């Protein structure tokens, strides 16, 4: 199973995502609550998958996604955001995200996207 970095500014959402991942046998190796921290933690941990919110303080998730992809073009990033507008989904995919999960979500949808991102 995969080593995962979970990034969201809401502690509750980090727990929801972490619990869903753990229930499927994945290991949450780190968490971050800002886009800036996400980039630093990615460099430090080199996870197999990163889940990333868009709306966060200091640096938004799309900026963090672009920076992570510049560091590691093979990075596997899954966007988990309440901003489900088509334009945000398209921008995320163009920047390199493997999939986009709209919050609120069912654990099954998250795990389906995780499987797709890791395939």
State each model region's role:
Residues 11-30:
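Two-component/phosphorelay signaling modules centered on CheY-like receiver
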Residues 34-37, 60-63:
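Acidic catalytic/metal-coordinating carboxylates
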Residues 45-51:
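Active-site beta3 strand of CheY-like receiver
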Residues 56:
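Receiver (REC) domain active-site loop signature in two-component systems and cognate sites
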Residues 83-84:
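Short, conserved "switch-loop" micro-motifs in signal-transduction and mechanochemical regulators
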Residues 87, 105-114:
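C-terminal output helix
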């Amino acid at each position: 199973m995969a080593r995962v970095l979970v990034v969201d500014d809401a502690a509750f959402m980090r727990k929801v995502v972490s619990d869903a991942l753990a229930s499927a046998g994945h290991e949450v190796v780190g968490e971050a609550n800002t886009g800036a921290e996400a980039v630093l933690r990615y460099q430090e941990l080199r996870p197999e998958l990163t889940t990333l919110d868009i709306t966060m303080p200091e640096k938004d998730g799309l900026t963090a996604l672009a920076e992570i992809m510049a560091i590691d073009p093979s990075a596997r990033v899954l966007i988990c955001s309440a901003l489900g507008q088509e334009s945000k989904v398209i921008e995320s995919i163009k920047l390199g995200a493997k999939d986009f999960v709209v919050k609120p979500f069912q654990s099954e949808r998250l795990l389906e996207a995780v499987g797709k991102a890791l395939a």
